[in-house]
Amino acid sequence: MSVVSSFHQSWKSLILASQRCNTVKQIKSTHSLFIIHGLHRNTYAISKLLTAFLHLPNLNKHFHYASSIFDSIEIPNSFVYDTMIRICSRSSQPHLGLRYFLLMVKEEEEDITPSYLTFHFLIVACLKACFFSVGKQIHCWVVKNGVFLSDGHVQTGVLRIYVEDKLLFDARKVFDEIPQPDVVKWDVLMNGYVRCGLGSEGLEVFKEMLVRGIEPDEFSVTTALTACAQVGALAQGKWIHEFVKKKRWIESDVFVGTALVDMYAKCGCIETAVEVFEKLTRRNVFSWAALIGGYAAYGYAKKATTCLDRIEREDGIKPDSVVLLGVLAACAHGGFLEEGRTMLENMEARYGITPKHEHYSCIVDLMCRAGRLDDALDLIEKMPMKPLASVWGALLNGCRTHKNVELGELAVQNLLDLEKGNVEEEEAALVQLSNIYFSVQRNPEAFKVRGMIEQRGIRKTPGWSLLEVDGIVTKFVSGDVSHPNLLQIHTLIHLLSVDASQIL
């Protein structure tokens, strides 16, 4: 073998070795050999070494080292830039991905141009850094360059930019520009609506997806079940249940099973929720939280506390903050005052979880339901952190129930300080206070507060209800006169009222 061929064989072996590095120690050793053999100036070889950083479990710790290797390259190519942007997207400094992209496009070399991979990794970095405005500029770039229509990963990334920024109207426009959206893109759009509490719109996307012949995956049905839970669409939830049973996803995917439990619990079928839960072959902390949340909604405090014992004994799962919140809520709805207080006091020692505002809100609510308003105020004043609006709101609700003007005024004052600028919350607090005044015949103060509401230009958000008929969820808003069959509706209500009065 000649000296030249031997030399090239050594280079080839070192480059292959760099691709097998799984620890930073191996990367450093290979880097040292690169320097010894003069490979550290070879762009191709260094690009392979940089790729090894993507396999490290603690990338953040070694990000500076990767950056220094990049800086040592005299003429980086597009693959090196792509790798560094990708490293940034997986680190705790995703914003630096934009820096490397700008270096790339400013490069004088004509052959260095961003590819579809560049934009894919850059969008991931922007999403992680919450650089949504930058993401929208990238959207313009990929449309102009023709990348948007040619690459599915870029399409999904751009769609996620608008979904994560909660610009759902724009997200829908982007989605409609995609020639043949796959199930992943349908999932992203549907999940965007559901995460914003727009369950009805999410279900419409799910139906449209089925009509277009797209086969749902596990994520699709999990999101759709969450939407059913939001709007009380029991009939549609049952249809999805039958669908996942045929697919055997309840046994294979714990999140599908958990979503079913949550859907039935929130749609008023706690017995069915329990039945589904008990048949789950795999359960996680979210499964238990869904069941306990269902028990809490029905005030089944004893059953909720029993779950707290079962979760560790049966599945070896340590309860988290959400599970304990569910148990506290169940205690509040069931009137289990001592059990709730004991749990709050022992949360840190027993479960290693420091109580948060929501846990204190539950206990304040529990004390108020029991008529212990002074004890509730004492607890608030002894909180280790400054009470948030949820805590004072719980006290205010108790003051209205028990007609306590003094504490009601205190709660409202704190709420107005905390919610300054939040029109809806300000209005809610002031309405509560005026109702307390009315309840104790202090009408002048009540009218004064109502005057403050009008003066601030606060308008009460009308109440609404959801009703599912034949799989269609309809929203009824208080005082709405826009329905085309309004006359028939009012006529029927009048007839029903007459019949009811005759029966009574």
UniProtKB/Swiss-Prot annotation:
Q: Might you name a Gene Ontology BP term for this protein?
A: RNA modification
Which residue ranges does the record annotate as region Type E(+) motif? Answer: 471-501
- Cross-referenced Gene3D superfamilies, in alphabetical order? Tetratricopeptide repeat domain
Q: Which Pfam families match?
A: E_motif, PPR, PPR_1, PPR_2
The UniProt annotation puts the region (Type E motif) at 391-470
A GO molecular function assigned to this protein is:
RNA binding
Q: Which InterPro entries match?
A: E_motif, Pentatricopeptide_rpt, PPR_At4g14850-like_plant, TPR-like_helical_dom_sf
Q: Where are the PPR repeats?
A: 77-107, 115-149, 151-181, 182-216, 217-251, 253-287, 288-319, 320-350, 356-390
The answer to keyword Repeat applying to this record is yes
Task: Give the UniProt keywords, A-Z.
Answer: Repeat
Which NCBIfam families does the record associate with it?
PPR
Family note: Belongs to the PPR family. PCMP-E subfamily.
Protein name according to UniProt: Pentatricopeptide repeat-containing protein At3g28660
Task: Supply the source organism for this entry.
Answer: Arabidopsis thaliana
